[in-house]
Amino acid sequence: MNFFEFLIEHLGKFIGYTAFANFTIGHLIMIIIGLTFIYLAIKKEFEPMLLVPIGFGILIGNIPFWGAEHIVSTDPQNLQIGVYQQGSVLNYLYFGVRYGVYPPLIFLGIGAMTDFSALISNPKLILIGAAAQLGIFGAYTAALTLGFSAAEAGAIGIIGGADGPTAIFLSSKLAPDLMGAIAVSAYSYMALVPVIQPPIMKLLTNSKERLIRMKPPRIVSKTEKILFPIIGLLLTCFIVPSGLPLLGMLFFGNLLKESTVTKRLADTAKGPMIDIVTILIGLTVGASTQATTFLTPKSVGIFALGAFSFMIATFGGVMFCKILNLFLKDGNKINPLIGNAGVSAVPDSARVSQVIGLEYDKTNHLLMHAMGPNVAGVIGSAVAAGILLSFLY
């Protein structure tokens, strides 16, 4: 065989290995979605820490290659390239998503950077965080109505908690086949909190309610801050032990912060560690959304239910504040504009409360009050995930 015969024989094989030979319209759609995520993150600054890794991961996951369907490590045609192919680097990194390793580590970092003072000083705000979980159970009911199984509906419903790590953790247990769509939906709507919530908040409140001034929160002692994660862990996990991986790490991270004797550990948890895990979770979740598995009618339903759950969660938080005010004396009333902060997109939903409040009164700063239900929502979404896991696993 001379050189030209060899070249002609193997040129066709080479072309068959390229992405051009395996490209479909589905891959094009997914690449456009990935580029849109990157655009929104960079140009509009919508959750860039999340959308840049996810968007780039979508690009990685939708570069088509020959033999993508060969996933078993012993298969000689497994090139060990794709996120689903055993033995590939991406598959090893995806292990943390598939088996729920990354979400508790994210919660450890969240705990280490969260100040629960606003919640400790005004404990009734935890009820707002609980009321906002209405979105989870509302979406769960809607998903059942649309024909999803109970386990799938539970995994979809958690999108309403506005907590990406919780959504990944629960879907990895209840509906691993839908995890990519659920995770991308959760993170997408987290990024769109400043767009979704304001119209609902304005619709549900009147001008008098928007001008309510809340009493400044009292100063919380160091002892209270140290006791909170310990008591919080015991109370929540004795009731919902299945939420222990998330709640345990959340409260442990907070104790590292508040004890002040483990500052180096707290700094590591809320700095390098959470940044590394965020990169890995975003990149691998994005890479898992391949055209063949992502572009399905179920994915469309998941995104629709995700939007519905966010709106119901915002509705639940705001309306609960209005109802609670019926039983509170003047001077102790709650501005219902902080009700949306029960949706646990920290601190974005609390910032929305601040921005909308300032539109009506330039001197009425609601951020410090909104952080109470905001951090309560983090706890509430983890508890809700534990409840769903207990009933549906």
Q: Where do the PLM segments sit?
A:
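Structural signature of hydrophobic alpha-helical transmembrane segments
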Residues: 19-30, 91-106, 150-160, 187, ...
